[in-house]
Every structure is written in C-alpha cells, then in structure tokens.
Amino acid sequence: VISPVDSATADSRGTPSAVKRALVLLLLVGCNAEGPMREPHPVSVRDELRPTDTSSGEMWRFLPSDTVERYDAPDGGYRVHFTRLAKNAVPATDVNADGTPDLVEAVASVYVEVGAKYHGELGFRRPANDVALASNGGSDRFDIYLVDFAFSADGAFRTDACTGEKCIGYVVQENDFVGYNYPNATVATRILGSHEYFHAVQAAYDNNQGANFSEGTAVWATEHFDPTTNDFEGFLPQFLARPDRSLDTAPTGPVSGYAYGSALFFEFLSQKYGVPIVRKLLERTENGSGHPSEPADAANPRWLVQLDAILKADHQSSFAEAFHTFIYWNFFTGPAADATKSYANGAAYPAPMMTTVAAPYRVDNQRVFYAASAWFQVPAAGRATMGAQLVDDPATAEDETAGMALVIAVRRGGVNSLALPITDVKSAATFDTSGAATLVVAVVNTAREGNAGVLSKRPGLCIGSPDELSACASALRPAPDAGIPDAGVPDAGLPDSGIPDAGTPDAGTADAGIPDSGVTAVDPPKGCGCSTASPALGALLVLASALRRRYAAAN
C-alpha cells in the first residue's frame, strides 16, 4: 500500500551539507564522557521528530519539497518511507510494474526476512512499539526512512523516546547506495538493515550496555542472519589487533572498528555454549532483570557480570573459564586454524596481534587489564625446551597472579603442534621446542571487572629455557629489603613490556602513557553509538563506523 504524506514547512535556516554538519558537531561536542549526554527522560515533542519533520534540524531528513510516500510490507510489520524526486529519490526501476520502486520492495522484504530470523528462530523481542508517539510514521509498524546520506554514512538506528533504558526508535538508511562500495543496494540493505534493526531489538531490553556490547552483538546478529556477507570477518583485524584492551571497554572517541569486531567474542559464546546464550544475555541486561545470583547487579545489570552468572547457572562454567577458553580458541585462526578445537570458520580469521621478543625474556610488572590478554611470540633460537611462568612479588599485599592464566603454543611452520591453556601459572610450564620456529605465549587476566578501582594485574613474566625460567623467577623474588616495603613505590617509568607507565597506579582514569585501553570503563554517552543516536550526537557514529563498515563489508 502506498500513500502520500503531507510535507512539513520549510526550514528557513537552510541546510548545510551532512558532512559539514557532522564535522561541526564533532568539533563542538566530540563524542566522549565530557560531551552532552542524552539521559533517559520522558517523551518530549523534540524527541519525537522523524526524518519527515523537515524543519527539525535532523541531519538526515526529507526536503520540504519532497512528497514522501509509504510502503507497507505485505507480510510483516514494517513500513518504508521514500520519495521519487530530487536528491532523496530512490531509483525509479519498477520491473514488475506494480507502481512501487523495486528498491523499496527489496528493502521491505529484507526487513521482513530479518525480523523472521530474529523474532522467530533466535527468539529475540520485537522493537518497542511506537504507537503512542505523535510522530510515529503513521502506524505502529517499524519505520525505515530512505534518504540521501551524501556519503556521510549509510544508515543509523535513531532513538526518539526512552523509558528508563528501554527505547523506541526507527532506522534511517541511504536511499540508493550509488557510489558506495557495496555490490548492490540489496546486499547493502542485508548488511545494514540486519545490523541497525538489531539495535532496535537491543533497545527493547536495555540501550545502555556500552559500544562493545551494542556493536559486537549487532555484527554477530548480521552474521547469523546472512553468513555469506563478510561484514563480521571485515572487523576482526581491528579487534584482534588490541587483545590488551578490556573486553567491555571501547576506545575513546567515535565508535571504532574494535567495538564492531568484538562480535568475535559473542560468536565464540554461541559456538561454545549455544546460540541462545546471546538472547539470554540480552534478557538479563534489562533493568531489574539481573540474575538472582548477582543481587547487587540486578537493578542496573552489566553484561559481563550477567554473563558470568549465566555461565555459572546454566553451563557449570564462569566468565573466567570462558575467557581463558576464548583466548585459547584465538590460537587457532588463519594458517593455524583447527575447527576441532576452535571456530568452525577460523581459517578466515586473522591471528591476534603479538609482540615479538627474544628469549630469555623477563618483565618485572606485566600489566594486563581485566578481561584482556598480552601476546608474545618468542623464537626458539635453538632451545630444545622452552616455557613460561608468572611470578608474584611477595612484597605486595595482593597476589598479582590471582585470576591470571596462560595459553602456550609451540608453532612449527605457522601451525600449532601443541597448544595448552594453563591455570597453574606460578609453575614453569615447559614444552619441547626442538626444531620449532616460535613459542607463542598469551598472558590472560580472567577477571570480569576491576577490583576496588584497580583495573589490571601486574605479575612478573618469564619466558625461556628451564634454566632461564629458574633464574628469572629467582630474580623476581627479591630478598626482604630491611623492612622497607616497595609496594606502591613508583617504578620510575621502567617499561612494562615496552609500555612506560611512569609509576602511575591504575586506580584512576589515567594510564600514564598506556593507550586508552586502561581508561576506566565509563558508559558511553547516549548517542555516541549507532544504537542510541540522539539529535545532537547521533550523526557522529557514522564518521568512525558506518563508512568503515561499508568498505570492510564489500571487500
């Protein structure tokens, strides 16, 4: 069914280009904890504006002169809004001559297919209904608006009303994809629509779980909707390039590819524990619905805490065990892939970023943030036996090896001849490295969160032959120093695996020279991700994420 929609009055201020507006917003307010935040609040007239409200100042909207039409998908609760003339026009091609442009029908069909997958097979909730909003697209159907993005992005989910942390919204997407790097508009919509629509699904549970959860689960959802796209694989290099970053902490600034690439962890969960675990996790993030085993987290749940509870209750496991296994699985990617021990499609995934060091290798304080890891590759250089161990400093009050784990592999010809997860990190674990090219060591912090504001552990690290390990461990266990405690004394900028920390404790938000992987995990401002784009900040997501997705997905 197609029906015209009345055009609104013209914007007397004029409209700068989408790109210029996005850059102006970025310069004025940025996209970090210091910028304006769109907190949950009662519905207001300003919030309820849609792209059809042409005088609204929305970045992506129809022109006052546009005649906007509606097309209702015949077999689903979706409505597509489009126009036939001027810059926002969809392609006029209508092969079946039914009066509706083919692209409009294709968009509607994709959303119907996406909805059937998400709400049928996968069992996720439908997006929150917008029937009570004054500007709701004319019905309670989920709305998709097709407008020209002028290469500022390719689409976004926008929220226009929230109750608590549950939000109502709609999707606005590129009208023709001409000049974009997708094979065609239908493929683009399959990638974009399945991703942005999943943000609407997330918003029906909780819209404030951070960029890694929001973007990671959305990319995961696209992969399960249509694994023939390479959207998922396209983001993995950016995630695996930063194994040292806490799993729930996205880089500062506009949403990055790292957040999208965190989909790998959710794919690991679904392959290891079953696909329903992601839905169960979303259900537990809803305010007031936290797992009963975590009463302190029930009112406003955090996803890592809730995942730990689900794993304990349903799988006799824990986040610590699962994360250790996740790192182990990541040893089997690329040329080292082994589907019997890791991902079904691991051959298509890159290896994590590693630091190449020479044995014997010693680090007095190897900083590893919670839910993160540090990777090393060490040439055997003729050593017949090699291994690694962690060492606690007896002068410190806290055991720096508590909650730590190792994964060690012997690689010959780029393939693991042996790889083992290790929990007894204080004992030297050694392996036959005769004829081996490389020993690969991952140091893993399996904690789900920091402890009393301290976000990392700093054990000593030794890698080498058995004799070298013994000498290293002895050197890292100094004799008592006449009663003078050295816990808390700055380390004068001595490098921890090459990263100077200037002796700054990590109980605060600063890293003292460590890139922002150690910044306290602050919930991102509303609107800094495409899942919660507000009128003030929503467009900023696309400068860092949508264009990246467009090119990564199509190559």
Predicted regions and their residues:
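N-terminal Sec signal peptide cleavage junction
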Residues: 31, 528-530
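Juxtacatalytic substrate-recognition/specificity segment
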Residues: 76-210, 217, 227-231
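Acidic/His/Gly-enriched intrinsically disordered linker/tail segments
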Residues: 160-166, 187, 191, 206-276, ...
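Beta/coil-rich, acidic/histidine-enriched accessory regions frequently appended to metallopeptidases
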Residues: 290-483
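A cross-kingdom C-terminal cell-surface attachment/processing module
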Residues: 534-551
